[in-house]
Regions:
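Class I SAM-dependent transferase core
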Residues: 2-71, 75, 105-121
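Short loop/edge segments at beta-strand edges and connector loops
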Residues: 46, 125-127, 199
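Conserved SAM/SAH cofactor-binding pocket of Class I
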Residues: 60-150, 156
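Short alpha-helix immediately C-terminal to the canonical SAM-binding loop
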Residues: 106-108, 177, 181
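Conserved beta-strand signature within the Rossmann-like core of class I S-adenosyl-L-methionine
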Residues: 166-176
Length: 237
């Protein structure tokens, strides 16, 4: 399906320690992604070369932006087709992975995928705002990550409630991250977060990426997260 040599070469360039067996796992991932995408809408990116760059390398760069301790717990909020966390779990099989999505059919795909490529994961069928208020998940994870299209302001409200104090929210963003961050500053603080650093990358197709590390420094107040409608109606400014 994908050009594994190209994937391995790119990983070498970015100093990502991907092994050949892991490239085989990602090849199977690409195959299943394209196959399932015909039944359910998972991604607009289906060309093999684009999958390598825009899905796999883009996701794996998360491990360059932050050191994930061995056995750390990671929840991917609104995971969709499994990006960025499933490629991260291929590279780091010690990570305790949880995949949260509001659409059950996406979770069915992810369960099949993880079984097929040998990635251990748990799935949670919930909206982010419900999961973040659930005692089973609230402030229970070392890390939360998201590569979603929602604004950073809203993503912070969705994701920081899942993170333990001392942990971090990892947001994967595009070239407009500075504007998003300026708009999100107060929301991040309100949720108990503090921006620790931003790592910028240029992908092989010249597209710009930023990975924002937001440290959880205090507990999220109990009234958060709110519903998407409330976030829109009363944004934290």
């Amino acid at each position: 399906m994908i050009d594994k040599a190209y994937l391995l070469e790119l990983c070498q360039q970015f100093e990502l320690p991907l092994q050949e067996s892991m490239a085989d796992q990602l090849d199977k991932y690409a195959e299943l992604l394209v196959e399932w995408n015909e039944k359910i809408n998972l991604t607009a990116i289906t060309e093999p070369k684009d999958i390598v760059v825009k899905h796999f390398v883009d996701s794996l760069l998360l491990t360059k932006a932050i050191e994930l301790p061995e056995g750390a717990s990671l929840i991917d909020v609104g995971t969709g087709a499994g990006f960025p966390s499933v490629p991260v779990a291929v590279l780091r099989s010690d990570i305790k992975l949880t995949l949260l999505d509001s659409l059950n059919k996406r979770l069915v795909f992810l369960e099949e995928l993880c079984k097929a490529i040998g990635v251990k994961s748990a799935t949670v069928h919930a909206r982010a705002e419900d999961g973040g208020k659930d005692k089973k998940h609230r402030e229970k994870y070392d890390f939360a990550c998201a590569r979603a299209v929602a604004s950073l302001r809203n993503l912070s409200e969705y994701c920081l409630p899942f993170v333990k104090v001392g942990g971090a929210f990892i947001a994967l963003k595009g070239p407009d991250w500075k504007e998003e961050l300026a708009e999100a500053k107060n929301a991040i603080g309100t949720m108990g977060g503090k921006v620790e650093k931003v790592e910028e990358f240029t992908l092989p197709d010249e597209s710009k990426r930023a990975i924002l590390i937001i440290r959880k420094v205090s507990q999220t107040p109990p009234q958060f997260p709110r519903t998407a409608a409330k976030m829109t109606k009363k944004p934290i400014v």
